[in-house]
Amino acid sequence: MPDALPPCSILILAGGRGQRMGGRDKGLVDWQGEPLIAHVHRAVRPLSDDLVISCNRNQAAYQAYADRLVGDAEADFPGPLAGVIAGLRVARHAWVVVLACDAPLVDRELIEGLLRLAVAGNSAAMVRQGGFWQPMFSVLPKRVLPVLEQAWAAGERSLQKALLREAVQGLECAESDRRLSNFNSPERLQD
């Protein structure tokens, strides 16, 4: 396989309720003096000319970190699957990196590893950590959009279950891999 990676879109999911954060918008919560979204943005910006953020509130604050914003088609924070569907609909490239807004330690090496794996297998790639899938660290071919839309129409709301309807390559990561840390509670922000 050639070293050159194909162009990809980046989709950052920031559309949740933030229940474990007391209802605060996780992407805009400060960590080390900056919003969590700023840390993720810094890691991914050099990798794509198409950075999409899925958010359902605070659009003005997120606009500074994205080329485009999308919201869920349904109200009331329907979950990450809805955000992925919305993002895939507008993505400009055939490959889409999916990340959460509350993973400030993600790095280029992890993203490029996922992208290489996806391209080599011509299928989705997702992190596996400690035997568990981590769908918020994945690369999807845009062509899975109809599969995800069908899953949604059939009542599926789990991003992981919807993605596993198709072939998925697993990128094994250690349980202690800090790059996969989700800062989704006030306690985690103390790390």
Swiss-Prot record:
<feature type="binding site">
    <location>
        <begin position="13"/>
        <end position="15"/>
    </location>
    <ligand>
        <name>GTP</name>
    </ligand>
</feature>
<comment type="function">
    <text>Transfers a GMP moiety from GTP to Mo-molybdopterin (Mo-MPT) cofactor (Moco or molybdenum cofactor) to form Mo-molybdopterin guanine dinucleotide (Mo-MGD) cofactor.</text>
</comment>
<comment type="subunit">
    <text>Monomer.</text>
</comment>
<keyword id="KW-0501">Molybdenum cofactor biosynthesis</keyword>
<dbReference type="GO" id="GO:0046872">
    <property type="term" value="F:metal ion binding"/>
</dbReference>
<feature type="binding site">
    <location>
        <position position="102"/>
    </location>
    <ligand>
        <name>GTP</name>
    </ligand>
</feature>
<dbReference type="GO" id="GO:0005737">
    <property type="term" value="C:cytoplasm"/>
</dbReference>
<dbReference type="GO" id="GO:1902758">
    <property type="term" value="P:bis(molybdopterin guanine dinucleotide)molybdenum biosynthetic process"/>
</dbReference>
<feature type="binding site">
    <location>
        <position position="26"/>
    </location>
    <ligand>
        <name>GTP</name>
    </ligand>
</feature>
<comment type="similarity">
    <text>Belongs to the MobA family.</text>
</comment>
<keyword id="KW-0342">GTP-binding</keyword>
<keyword id="KW-0547">Nucleotide-binding</keyword>
<feature type="binding site">
    <location>
        <position position="72"/>
    </location>
    <ligand>
        <name>GTP</name>
    </ligand>
</feature>
<dbReference type="Pfam" id="PF12804">
    <property type="entry name" value="NTP_transf_3"/>
</dbReference>
<keyword id="KW-0479">Metal-binding</keyword>
<dbReference type="GO" id="GO:0005525">
    <property type="term" value="F:GTP binding"/>
</dbReference>
<dbReference type="GO" id="GO:0061603">
    <property type="term" value="F:molybdenum cofactor guanylyltransferase activity"/>
</dbReference>
<protein>
    <recommendedName>
        <fullName>Molybdenum cofactor guanylyltransferase</fullName>
        <ecNumber>2.7.7.77</ecNumber>
    </recommendedName>
</protein>
<dbReference type="InterPro" id="IPR025877">
    <property type="entry name" value="MobA-like_NTP_Trfase"/>
</dbReference>
<keyword id="KW-0808">Transferase</keyword>
<keyword id="KW-0460">Magnesium</keyword>
<keyword id="KW-0963">Cytoplasm</keyword>
<feature type="binding site">
    <location>
        <position position="102"/>
    </location>
    <ligand>
        <name>Mg(2+)</name>
    </ligand>
</feature>
<dbReference type="InterPro" id="IPR013482">
    <property type="entry name" value="Molybde_CF_guanTrfase"/>
</dbReference>
<dbReference type="InterPro" id="IPR029044">
    <property type="entry name" value="Nucleotide-diphossugar_trans"/>
</dbReference>
